[in-house]
Amino acid sequence: MITIRSLRPNDYHAWQALWRGYLAFYKTELAEHVYRTTFERLCSNDITTQNAIIAQLGGEMVGLVHYIFHPHNWRVEDVVYLQDLFTAPQQRGKGVAKALITAVYHASDQAGCPSVYWMTQEFNHQARHLYDQIGQLTPFIKYTR
């Protein structure tokens, strides 16, 4: 059975291992201080815009999701950006990612936020199969600086 809960301060090493796996998928590496700072923000009671939820199977952390509440100029309510979602490779196909996204939907609803959005790379076919079932594909293209 999948257990979903908020990230806790004593989760650092298990969280870091999962996040490193996520970043490796996208061929990205970060400095150690970025891991520490991000983790501290995600666990902080003073920073309520950045959040993290983890999934456990048999007491082992097997998935994570990071999400951010932020204002939107076209709405009165905040919206939620689901920034990072990762399931340990050996646990894929067991409903972990869907459970994590559902938890973000629930947090968004509880906060009165009408919209949750996220991005993925075009080649991420396995994830896109799930996203096509629980979200709506938009025609937007992302640019960055």
Where are these regions (language model features)?
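A conserved beta-turn-beta hairpin within the catalytic core of GNAT-like acetyltransferases
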Residues: 71-82, 92, 139
